[in-house]
A protein has these predicted regions:
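N-terminal secretory signal peptides that target proteins for export/translocation
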Residues: 1-8
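Sec-dependent signal peptide recognition
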Residues: 8-16
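N-terminal signal peptide c-region/cleavage motif recognized by signal peptidases
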Residues: 20-24
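Copper-binding active sites and cupredoxin-like electron-transfer domains
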Residues: 25-505
Length: 505
């Protein structure tokens, strides 16, 4: 009883002391460590990706060799909502991911992925819009101008992240051996404040994914409005993947929460004048990268059947789609293409506070990198003013290409359409399909199973890697288009939909 009386006597004093303390709270958090156990050395700003000369560890015990492969890569994105202007001029309500790091890179059509030292430089820009009409209240003139650093201030994350989404989402590109930290911050549903939508990131096709980072809400974390979560990945085998939100996938994919992702092979980092067959053999010294065709039916990169003695740097080639060991996936220029579709009725119902009809979902607007023809051939780098008056990058990724005759083009094609199969055809430039779903088309004996065609067909959730070789192709404009006539329009009689141009000079 005495203790209770003492407690009551001191309670008012304790409460007064608590009132005097400063209050602080922050749910947005961004993570990008400069070093880890796998990558103990800091890569300074401006560093190139480390060369691949030997495994970082050998044998089952992973004995360190002193060689550090790959790097720490980071990227930051927002999840929210907004509107898109479709090719018929209508405003379409959408959900979307947007950039919160690498804004300068993304505005120029490049991946927003950066090494840790560049990512961790503070973001500092004088204006919120590219037209330089809306001053940024958090701008610090005393600090260097930096459009690519991560945005970590909560107020700035809202200033930049709201109404700043794109379809497809910010492009992600990493290398084999990289550790990748991806932070997603949920900035809320500004146009539908009645919605308390959670968002996640699902790395589609990631093998043996940890459920904690897989983005499926039943077994992992879902990010509430005002919260952040950092996903961690050790880069998988090279190939073309994609990513999307895994909250009610038919809805969130249909509404636009889809993005492109590809992993570059170690072979790109092999020193000049190295035999690619020998370099691929070197990977067999590390159990983490070894490909034992006699014991592992999932071996992704078997050695070629014959050593072609292709040397790194031959005819200037240092870029490949896969660890092929024979140079057969070499390319000069790459163009990531993501196919997507909109059902305008589904989006309209979602905008007007009504229950959405999943059984009746049927896409009628078809997109290449977020564009329908004729916008597919418009130059990248355009801007669109949102309802808040801020002009933001609009579809910064190009969906057309201009090349010199003789160059090899790598098309990284993925399909995130929810309701339709999609076909793309190329007339005049033959297609060589080299990979399906991030797996090189090669049997376990090392025989390449590539095939030539003039059209490819994908279902939602599939990817293809295609080489277009312009050797012997006459200069001119060539079309990449769908032969499905109802997909070659913008829900109208005139041409539109899935069509773009490749110009050979």
């Amino acid at each position: 009883m005495l203790r209770e009386q003492q407690y009551r006597r001191w309670l008012p004093t304790i409460l007064l002391c608590l009132v005097a303390l400063p209050a602080s709270a922050q749910s947005f958090r961004v993570q990008c460590p400069p070093t880890t156990n796998l990558h103990p050395a800091v890569l300074p700003v401006g560093s190139q990706d480390p060369a691949y000369t030997a495994p970082a560890a050998t044998g089952q015990t992973s004995t360190p060799t002193g060689v550090v492969n790959g790097a720490i890569k980071c990227q930051e994105i927002s999840g929210g909502d907004g509107y898109a202007t479709t090719a018929d001029g209508n405003q379409t309500y959408m959900f979307s991911f947007g950039p919160l790091s690498g804004l300068g890179l993304i505005a120029s059509g490049q991946p927003g992925t950066q090494i840790a030292s560049e990512f961790n430089l503070p973001y500092n820009a004088p204006f919120l819009d590219l037209a330089a009409t809306k001053p940024d209240p958090t701008y610090k003139p005393s600090l260097p101008l930096n459009m690519n650093g991560a945005i970590t201030d909560p107020a700035e994350m809202m200033n930049v992240g709201v109404m700043n989404g794109n379809i497809p989402a910010p492009l992600i590109a990493i290398n084999e051996d990289d550790e990748f930290f991806l932070t997603l911050s949920n900035v809320g549903m500004i146009m539908r404040p009645d919605l308390f939508e959670q968002h996640t990131v699902h790395f589609h096709g990631y093998p043996n994914a940890s459920s904690y980072y897989d983005g499926v809400p039943d077994a992992s974390i879902a990010i509430n409005i005002g919260g952040s979560f950092t996903y961690y990945y050790l880069a998988p085998d090279a190939g073309t993947y994609f990513w999307h939100c895994h909250i009610t996938p038919p809805e969130h994919l249909q509404m636009g929460m889809v993005g492109q992702l590809y992993v570059r092979p170690r072979q790109n980092r092999v020193p000049l004048n190295t035999n690619l067959y020998t370099a691929l053999q070197t990977q067999q010294l590390d159990l983490r990268t070894a490909c034992n065709v006699t014991a592992d039916i999932l071996c992704a990169t078997p050695l070629p059947y014959v050593n072609t003695n292709f040397i790194q740097g031959t005819n200037g080639y240092t870029k490949y789609a896969y660890n092929d060991g024979d140079g057969s996936t070499r390319y000069d220029v790459e163009l990531p293409i993501q196919i997507h579709g909109f059902d305008p009725n589904f989006h309209f119902v979602g905008m007007t506070f009504n229950p959405e009809g999943f059984a009746d979902m049927k896409d009628k607007h078809f997109l290449l990198n977020g564009r329908s023809y004729p916008d597919t051939v418009a130059p990248a780098g355009q801007t669109t003013a949102a309802s808040d008056g801020i002009s933001r990058p609009s579809q910064p990724m190009s969906s057309t290409l201009t090349v010199k005759a003789g160059q090899r083009i790598l098309l990284r094609i993925s399909d995130l359409d929810v309701s339709e199969f999609q076909t793309l055809a190329s007339l005049g430039i033959p297609m060589q399909v080299i990979a399906l779903n991030a797996r090189l088309l090669r049997d376990q004996a090392g025989n390449n199973l590539y095939y030539n065609t003039n059209s490819i067909t994908l279902g939602g959730g599939e990817s293809l890697d295609v080489i277009l070789d312009t050797t012997g192709v006459a200069p001119g404009t060539y079309f990449l288009f769908t032969p499905q006539l109802d997909h070659l329009s913008n829900d109208a009689e005139n041409f539109g939909g899935l069509m773009t141009e490749i110009v050979v000079q």
